[in-house]
Amino acid sequence: MESWLIPAAPVTVVEEIKKSRFITLLAHTDGVEAAKAFVESVRAEHPDARHHCVAWVAGAPDDSQQLGFSDDGEPAGTAGKPMLAQLMGSGVGEITAVVVRYYGGMLLGTGGLVKAYGGGVNQALRQLTTQRKTPLTEYTLQCEYSQLTGIEALLGQCDGKIINSDYQAFVLLRVALPAAKVAEFSAKLADFSRGSLQLLAIEE
């Protein structure tokens, strides 16, 4: 995906259902480790809760390698899965949902739990503000000092930026560009430098 929506700010929704209190929290989490860290922070804030059920889409919305969920002691399939279904249906990426349940003494039944957990995430998503993320790919570029201002202007035209500059006899730049703009920038760079400059991919 060239770009996707991510949470712009965290959301908290509190609901009481049959004497149980459900607290739904959404947050931006860039990657699985960030998702796990957010879950642990919620556990620390609510140590006395009966359940801390979880779902995350930790990468791009279509990245199935970064999905996760947990029922945390609720009957299998009644919490994490309906929560994840809501997240996946939203089209938002890099997002984690935690629903904290303080048990009130009344059983909700399987259908009631699915509705409570999925419904809590649905309510929170309706309150969520988002922003668009365009991932950037990094390259190196070697240029003369006299070419630097022109390169900065070209990067600006292509939504790119300079990550790092190393000033020696020449300038070694580390630049970042959206994938969709690389061909355009390369063409502009060739025109600007009369073919003497080119982007070099960074080997992992």
Where are these regions (language model features)?
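Terminal, non-globular segments
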Residues: 175, 181-182
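C-terminal regulatory domains involved in ligand/effector binding and gene-expression control
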Residues: 1-77, 164, 200-204
